């Protein structure tokens, strides 16, 4: 993708994925592995960037990790059940894929 750096709010609730990307690209210089990790992260990026619920997704992602970030400030509303289920599934799928990528290269 060509970026030299990246700041992503998702790293607050999915640090392992972001660390895997850093390790692959920066520490190992394995850009094929890095692209695979980033590809596994793209569904999460889509959820975060589409639908106008970025803040709510970040807060719920933190909740899934046991970190209480409180409710979103008004006028924002918390995620509904379907949005929560979708985000949780995207994170689960991403984590499984990245574990597999890391396992295949160790």
Task: Briefly describe each language-model feature range.
Residues 104-106:
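Eukaryotic N-terminal low-complexity, Ser/Thr- and Lys/Arg-rich leader segments
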């Amino acid at each position: 993708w060509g970026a030299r750096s990246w700041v992503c709010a998702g790293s607050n609730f999915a640090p392992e994925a972001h660390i895997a990307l850093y390790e692959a690209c920066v520490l190992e210089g394995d850009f094929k592995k890095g692209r695979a990790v980033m590809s596994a992260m793209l569904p999460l990026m889509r959820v975060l960037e589409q639908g106008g619920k970025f803040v709510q997704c970040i807060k719920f992602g933190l909740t899934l990790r046991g970190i209480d970030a409180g409710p979103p400030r008004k006028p924002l509303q918390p995620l509904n059940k379907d949005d929560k289920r979708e985000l949780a599934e995207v994170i689960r799928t991403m984590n499984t894929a990245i574990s597999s990528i890391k396992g295949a290269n160790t």
